[in-house]
Amino acid sequence: GKPEDYDDEKDAEKIIIGELWVTPKTFTSDVAETLSCLRKEAKRRRKLYDDNAQYVGEFGNYLHIIGYDKDKEFDKRYGYVPGQIVEKINGGNLQWLEIFIHAPFKEDVETSKDKDDKNIISIVMQFGFKIEDVKDIVCKAIFAGDAEHPVWTHILENNTDKDRLMWNILLAPHHCSWTFFNSTSNKDEIVDAANKILTDYQIGSNAHII
């Protein structure tokens, strides 16, 4: 809800989400009942932008939609697409973090509508962490939500910079589900994309999957 309605005493056990990131699927009517409050909040925030062409957001009202609106991008004030580097969070410049967006792709957004597939539009990102007095990124982490192997195939097909897929930390895709590896019950089968992500992009021998 509106951040100005937050009551320090009554709402003490609640948090204000300064900046909300969602996919286009959030705005459809078929989201799970448990996500209805998230959809309501995303719609509230989007309306602030759509009602005022000069609005650029504020803490508790910031919104970013990751992906595409059919065949076009969303309003650049709140839209992010694959290949984009995020430079600000909550209106402030990122000093110690660099975020690169890999997915969801335009074709996967459309597939999610046709097949009611929520996993195919998972947000996939690389976080690059920095420390003071060191110019280069010192740790890279990949976060991929519920992305299954077709998403990783698309990422590899579209990626033009190997560094953007390198990782010291990989959050286990799709909560350790086998669908990261293939679409069958054959656990001896590992699709090429999964194998490459796990072997070709791991940084050193101290990388971790969590």
Model-derived segments and their meaning:
Residues 1-141, 147:
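Flexible, acidic/histidine-containing loops and adjacent segments that form or flank the divalent-metal
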Residues 1-10, 105-205, 209:
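Active-site-proximal loop/helix segments of hydrolase catalytic cores
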